[in-house]
């Protein structure tokens, strides 16, 4: 399973430009970031979102077409607490890959018991 953690709203930098939005909903080209993220895994994909976020109809249709399951999380949880909540709520017993909602990879070779690290070219306040 691929869990995309996107249960906090984006930082002020992005809010000024795109409005109150989650990192995985940021536009990239003519798509949402989650559309690229979902293609990184052949496994089931789950996207965590704040429980006070209303997903619009267009995005719901895209998410359904991509077979992305949504899980809604309290937005005031820390990243670790949010991940733990998702693991417990989804009853995950198999492999789990975690991708942060603001992360873009054109391709990614997800291996069991591994950690991927990437250099940051530009920095901003993390969600």
Residues covered by each model-derived region:
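Glycine-rich, phosphate-binding/catalytic loops in enzymes
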Residues: 19-23, 113-116
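Short, well-ordered beta-to-alpha junction loops that form the rim of enzyme active sites
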Residues: 100-102
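Conserved core of the sugar-phosphate nucleotidyltransferase
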Residues: 57, 104-127
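Conserved N-terminal catalytic core of the sugar/cofactor nucleotidyltransferase
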Residues: 1-14, 18-20, 27, 31-98
């Amino acid at each position: 399973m691929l869990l995309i953690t996107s249960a906090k709203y984006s930082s002020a930098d992005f809010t000024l430009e795109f409005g109150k939005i989650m990192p995985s909903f940021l536009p990239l080209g003519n798509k949402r970031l989650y559309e690229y993220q979902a293609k990184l895994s052949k496994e089931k994909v789950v996207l965590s979102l704040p429980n006070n976020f209303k997903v619009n109809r267009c995005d719901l249709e895209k998410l359904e077409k991509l077979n992305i399951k949504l899980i809604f999380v309290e937005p005031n949880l820390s990243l670790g607490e949010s991940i733990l909540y998702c693991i417990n709520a989804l009853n995950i017993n198999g492999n789990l890959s975690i991708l942060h909602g603001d992360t873009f990879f054109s391709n990614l070779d997800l291996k069991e018991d591994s950690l991927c690290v990437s250099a940051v070219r530009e920095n901003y306040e993390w969600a």
